[in-house]
Amino acid sequence: MTTKIKTLLDYTRDKTNFNSIERYVDYLARYIDYVAGGNVQADIVSAKEPKYHFLQYKADATHNVTRPFNSELFVGKDIFDCQRDDFFRLLKDISIAKEDDELRRTINRMVYSCQQAIGMTLDALPSAENNKAKKLNGDLFEVFIRLLIAEIGVTVKEMTEKVTVRANDQYSFDMNYQHDVMLYKGEELRAIGSVKTSSKDRGDKVFVDKFLYNKLTDLDIPHFAIYLNDVQRAGKAPKFHVNSTFLTAHFMGYTVKLNPLDGVYYCDITHLMQQNDILLKEIHTLDKLFVDDIWKFVGKEPVHSRTRYDD
C-alpha cells in the first residue's frame, strides 16, 4: 500500500509518536521509503553548492519544496540498514567510535537524517502552519537529543530552574531559566546545554545565558550548544540555492569579548564555520560531544549503557 504524505504528516504532528530512539529511526525508514517510492516530483540540486538538494512534493502537498538537505549526510536507502545497525551498536557502547572516524560519521549522519526526515515532512504543510511546524520540529529535536544522551548512560534532565538573585545579602527576586539539557553526575549539575535546529534566532542567547547564569549563581557551570545545521533555502524555482544562517561576526564577538562556550556542536558544519582559527577551535561535529566531551563534562568514563540492542 502506497504511503500518502498526509499519513506522514499526521504521524509527525503527534509528538507522542516520538518517545524512543527506535521511533525516530523507524520514521526515517518510512520517509526514505516514501521518497524512494516515486512520491516526489523532483530532486532539485542547489545551484551554488551541489551537495545540497531540495525535494519538491507532488500535488497532494501543493508542490511544496523542502528545506535543503546535505546529500553527503542524509542516509539513503542503499546504506540505511548498515547505518542503522552501526548506530544502535554505538548506543550500546559509544567508546567504540573513539578511534573510528567512520563510526563517528554515523552518529552525525543518523541524527541529522532522523531529524531532517521530520523537518522535510513538515515542509509539506501549508505556509500558514509554518510557525507551528517550526516549533514542533524544534521540540522533537530536543527530545531526540535527550533520549540519545540518556541512552549512552548520562543523567539528563529538562527543567525550568528558579535562580534566586540577592543584592547585599538580601532577597531581591527570582529569575526562571528554561534549560533544554542539564547534565548530572549523581545529583550534581555538571553542564547545561541549548538544543536548537539552527542558531538563526537564538544563537546569541546561549552566550548571554552562560554569563548571567554563572554570575547570578556564583558557579562556573559549562554551557554548550547543539545545532542541526545553519542553512536555509534561497532563490526561486528552478534556481534554488542555500544561504547560511550562521552569523560569523556575532559568534566571534561573543566568544572573544563575552565568554566562549564550552562546546558548540553541529551535525552539518559549513565552510563558513571553518574559515579561521577561532571557529575551528570552537565548533565541532556532534560526534565529539557524544564520544569525547560529554564524559569530560560529567567526569566519568563511557559506559556500556544498555542491552536491549544486543543480538
PLM-predicted stretches and their roles:
Residues 3-153:
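Interdomain/boundary linker segments immediately adjacent to catalytic/signaling cores
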Residues 191-192, 219-227, 262-264:
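Hydrophobic beta-strand segments of well-ordered beta-sheets in folded domains
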